[in-house]
């Protein structure tokens, strides 16, 4: 069965394919912000105030106040000294990687590191588990003894849902210059206290500079990206030609963000409720999925689950990523926009699949 489709509407908790309606469990809109009516109203208010886009340099001689305001709020939220917003998660990774590339840096990439953070177009990634990589990285850094080591990893495995632990970050060599970059694109907004993500959970020694980069387009529903770091590093990025030549996030999104605390809180709670409702009813079906506690994604090795659920009016994630020719990644992605009745129907059909497939 083909699983590639083209539609002419933005997905929400349902999509229309060839005249038939399907419950939609894919994508990365974990908090459903891109279809939230209250957030849309704030976005329109922002457009009325700041226009639809701002194609000028952030280093020009006329600045909009909303950028500094939003960045200060984001930094306080996640526990960083400073934040810098850019036009995408890819740009957030690249503004950091391309600067560090000029600093006599040696890069060490964890398995499955996102290409947004590559300092070169093609980077070879370790073909081991994150756990195995983490158990050796401290020794590898110590033995290499590079002038400046840059470690790059994701905050979580959002594809296959293997758990990531970060106790190793506090045991990195203390006699070397080290930068640790963590991509929190699939955590920011839905993990950590009040959705603040990974940064507060990481412990490093004084010689290790901690940087968190993230897309804002996923849980947060903001078409942009962000870098969290210390004051000195963010100031350095601000004055690079790379940053100066980039158009910023459309300011209307940051206006909406500044006024959306209650909306985020409401949708975070709804997502938690949906995760609890789904997970608590899995029981004997637990072996079908890899999952992380309190995380809205469920990965299955049983790719035939996609076809089965599709026949039942449920559309789930099933495609190879990041390389199209690879094995499909079959996943169920929950969002705050799903209703209780949708979750119950999904559970019922998952249990039905388990019986048929003898899981």
Label for each model-derived stretch:
Residues 272-313, 336:
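Conserved PLP-binding catalytic core of the aspartate aminotransferase-like
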Residues 96-117, 134, 138-140, 271:
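Conserved PLP-anchoring active-site segment centered on the Schiff-base-forming lysine
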Residues 296-301, 314-352:
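Conserved PLP-binding active-site segment of the aspartate aminotransferase-like
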Residues 190, 202-236:
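Active-site PLP attachment segment
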Residues 130-182:
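Active-site phosphate-binding strand-loop segment of PLP-dependent enzymes
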Residues 1-53:
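N-terminal "arm"/small-domain region of PLP-dependent enzymes with the aminotransferase-like
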Residues 232-233, 247-270, 274-279, 283:
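Structural motif of enzymes handling amino- and sulfur-group chemistry
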Residues 40-88:
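Conserved N-terminal alpha-helix of the aminotransferase class I/II PLP-enzyme fold
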């Amino acid at each position: 069965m083909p699983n590639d489709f083209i539609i002419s509407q933005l997905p929400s908790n349902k999509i229309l394919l060839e005249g038939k309606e399907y419950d939609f469990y894919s994508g990365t809109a974990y908090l459903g912000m891109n279809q939230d009516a209250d957030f849309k109203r704030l976005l329109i208010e922002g457009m009325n105030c700041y226009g639809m886009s701002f194609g000028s340099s952030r280093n020009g001689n006329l600045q909009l106040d909303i950028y500094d305001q939003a960045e200060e709020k984001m930094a306080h939220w996640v526990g960083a000294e400073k934040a810098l917003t850019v036009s995408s998660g890819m740009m957030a990774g690249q503004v950091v990687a391309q600067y560090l590339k000029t600093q006599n840096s040696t890069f060490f990439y964890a398995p499955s590191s996102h290409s947004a953070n590559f300092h070169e177009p093609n980077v070879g990634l370790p073909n081991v588990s994150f756990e195995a990589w983490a158990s050796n990285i401290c020794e590898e850094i110590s033995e290499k003894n590079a002038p400046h080591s840059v470690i790059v990893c994701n905050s979580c495995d959002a594809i296959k849902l293997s758990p990531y632990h970060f106790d190793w970050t506090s045991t990195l060599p203390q006699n070397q210059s080290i930068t640790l970059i963590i991509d929190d694109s699939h955590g920011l907004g839905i993990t950590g206290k009040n959705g603040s993500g990974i940064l507060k959970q990481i412990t490093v020694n004084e010689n290790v500079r901690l940087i968190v980069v993230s897309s804002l387009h996923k849980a947060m529903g903001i078409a942009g990206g962000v870098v969290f770091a210390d004051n000195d590093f963010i100031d350095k990025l601000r004055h690079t030609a790379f940053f100066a030549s980039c158009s910023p996030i459309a300011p209307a999104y940051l206006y909406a963000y500044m006024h959306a605390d209650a909306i985020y809180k409401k949708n975070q709670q709804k997502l938690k409720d949906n995760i609890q409702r789904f997970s608590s009813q899995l029981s004997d079906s637990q072996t079908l999925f890899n999952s992380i506690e309190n995380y809205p994604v469920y990965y299955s090795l049983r790719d035939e689950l996609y076809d089965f659920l599709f026949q039942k009016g449920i559309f789930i994630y099933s495609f190879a990523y990041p390389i199209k020719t690879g094995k499909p990644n079959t996943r169920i992605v929950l969002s705050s926009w799903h209703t209780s009745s949708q979750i119950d129907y999904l559970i019922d059909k998952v249990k039905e699949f388990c019986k048929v497939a003898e899981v």
